[in-house]
Amino acid sequence: MSQVILDLQLACEDNSGLPEESQFQTWLNAVIPQFQEESEVTIRVVDSAESHCLNLTYRGKDKPTNVLSFPFEVPPGMEMSLLGDLVICRQVVEKEAQEQGKPLEAHWAHMVVHGSLHLLGYDHIEDDEAEEMEALETEIMLALGYEDPYIAEKE
């Protein structure tokens, strides 16, 4: 049976009201075992300041962002199950959910699904890549019992 090992790091000034570790685990399990037998993923939930700093350092964008994905590149000749790290910004996720009229839990789930697909090598820079990635995200979100996260864009 496929297994995803989760290292959850809650690094917000106030960690109350965040999803439970079991929810993060469920969301990861909905994505990664489809592609990989065994994996280890770190999810770090942060405040805007840390997200801003990381986004500026690694993407050159001077603002916080919802989710950053840092895939782990296994050195040649080594076998490791470490897939990578997701850094999710609490304030951005909460603000986006409110602005987009989405249930907060569903938006958290979407950020984990979206970030996990990035760790697995999916991207959305080119239109065809974006369509493939969004279709996978939608399929996974529906399987989890949530709405299509892109439904507003399709209407």
UniProtKB/Swiss-Prot annotation:
Residues binding Zn(2+): 114, 118, 124
GO BP term, pick one: rRNA processing
Membrane-traversing stretches: none
Cofactor note (record): Binds 1 zinc ion.
CC per GO annotation: cytoplasm
Coiled coil segments of this chain: none
HAMAP family registered for this protein in UniProt: Endoribonucl_YbeY
Protein name: Endoribonuclease YbeY
The organism of origin for this protein: Escherichia coli O7:K1 (strain IAI39 / ExPEC)
